[in-house]
Amino acid sequence: MFEYAPAPESRSVVDIKPAYGLFIDGKFVDPSDGGSFKSINPATEEVLAEIAEAGSGDVDRAVRAARTAYEKVWGPMPGRDRAKYLFRIARIIQERSRELAVLESLDNGKPIKESRDVDLPLVAAHFFYYAGWADKLPFAGFGPNPQPLGVAAQVIPWNFPLLMLAWKIAPALAAGNTVVLKPAETTPLTALLFAEICQQADLPPGVVNIVTGAGETGRALVEHPGVDKVAFTGSTEVGRAIARSVAGSRKKLTLELGGKAANIVFDDAPIDQAVEGIVNGIFFNQGHVCCAGSRLLVQESVADRVLESLKRRMAQLRLGDPLDKNTDIGAINSAAQLARIKELSDAGAAEGAERWSPPCELPDRGFWFAPTIFTGVTQAHRIAREEIFGPVLSVLTFRTPAEAVEKANNTPYGLSAGIWTDKGSRILWTADRLRAGVVWANTFNKFDPTSPFGGYKESGYGREGGRHGLEAYLNV
């Protein structure tokens, strides 16, 4: 393995304040009960900032501000004028992309090259894309006069904090809605910096409101009677609870939940290319990806070759400081998530699967887990059935295409899948039979703002991205 000199990105581009308030009606304000919590750097366990915790009264203030802005300013505003604000936000994101990328890596633990080269370009692209839709809604196929829903409550996860914010806020604003957004409690900082960007863009007060806190804050937001739309990305367990709480109300709901994607490698696949796709599919963002290719289904005749090449490639991965530009695998986002990964990995070994990790020195401080694969996995193993949400790959084999499809679909989830083969006809045959919302062919984890994203079964319902993403925020 090549030795690389450290290439750290400077923290000096980011000015992290000691404490942050709630962003309500265009201003940062203190919570009504004075509650707060700490946001920490998962790579070092260093406290980054003290974050205000919103209570039910604060959530009510935010929803009322959003309602006023919707009725008096944003809702009546012509689409071409809304577009100007979205274009302005997109340009500011581009101008401040280095600052945002560094802050994302500090707060989340992901490698800087991922936040810099993947997350931030996609964030800006989503705002640019939906800015272009804002004045074209009557011609988008939703009827001659589609109308916004009103106030959208949005709850986002910790794995792609700023990108999930863009997925939620950009289409909502383009459609004429106002927003109250709650970021995950472990990764609030880029959402709060986005609030500053809204101020910099002169976005009218109340159009975007950001309330920080844990589960109780999210529950108060989702259950608030002044909300017209709920959009949630996160675990299937929480998604079920939200669906129950919204049932019987007038609120529209979009859920993007867990996944246990199958990455299928046929015997005619280009092995080296497939191995790169396998590594990207499961170790990108430390496996903290809802659509991660966490189940590798490889045809028996090439299984040994694929595994040999995969282990050789895994030995080249560099784990360490997320701000080092050479780092491939950063820190696990929290102690709780690390415990979950360890629990399921230990269960895999206890149930008889063979565990392998490359030689890997883990830092003394922070939350770390070495990239890991399990072979000898059966469909009865917990590691083949449950979402681990970490850098852990379960390897299963198959003999025929029909068996591959049967095993791939044998999961309560249905978010994504990957197919690796040299035959276009086999790609089409397999994709047609996979019960997954997104199917990649000879690639993995490719995203674009023009493409809808979402799943089936326990992976949720509704689509985000593309023209489809607008429909979730319109009365059609």
Label each region the model flagged.
Residues 46-50, 203, 227, 264, ...:
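Conserved C-terminal structural/oligomerization subdomain of aldehyde/semialdehyde dehydrogenase
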Residues 38, 52, 75-76, 210, ...:
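A structural signal for short, well-ordered beta-strand elements
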Residues 46-137:
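Glycine-rich loop-to-alpha-helix module at the N-terminal edge of alpha/beta enzyme cores
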Residues 45, 82, 104, 176, ...:
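Residue-level signal for inorganic ion chemistry
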Residues 67-70, 74, 90-97, 101, ...:
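Structural signal for hydrophobic packing residues in well-ordered secondary-structure cores
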